[in-house]
Amino acid sequence: MLKLNLQFFASKKGVSSTKNGRDSESKRLGAKRADGQFVTGGSILYRQRGTKIYPGENVGRGGDDTLFAKIDGVVKFERKGRDKKQVSVYAVAE
């Protein structure tokens, strides 16, 4: 009697799933208006998490720390003491 010793090999490599390959969507934070730019009341000036920049004159702070203009005017980014920054909106004299 004839004995055959056959061994079969996988025709496809086993594929493992990766735990990488995804990233969160960007939040589009940062300055939305430049220094010296004219803005209308309600315009968003700066989107941030926490108070990286503080609200100055005629600028409000939203629930998510977004800074917005309260009046029509010109944007001015300023220093507030040694290590803090603020953004203000000044009315334009007509």
UniProtKB/Swiss-Prot annotation:
HAMAP family: Ribosomal_bL27. This is Large ribosomal subunit protein bL27. The keyword Ribonucleoprotein applies. The N-terminus is cleaved by ribosomal processing protease Prp. Uncleaved protein can be incorporated into pre-50S ribosome subunits. Cleavage of the N-terminus of bL27 is essential for growth; it cannot be replaced by a 'pre-cleaved' or non-cleavable form. GO terms for cellular component: cytosolic large ribosomal subunit. Residues 1-9 form a propeptide. GO terms for biological process: translation. Disruption phenotype: Essential, it cannot be disrupted. NCBIfam families: L27 (TIGR00062). GO terms for molecular function: structural constituent of ribosome. Disulfide bonds: none annotated. Pfam families: Ribosomal_L27 (PF01016). Belongs to the bacterial ribosomal protein bL27 family. It comes from the Bacteria. Part of the 50S ribosomal subunit. A mutant Prp protease unable to cleave bL27 copurifies with its substrate. Keywords: Ribonucleoprotein, Ribosomal protein. SUPFAM superfamilies: Ribosomal L27 protein-like (SSF110324).
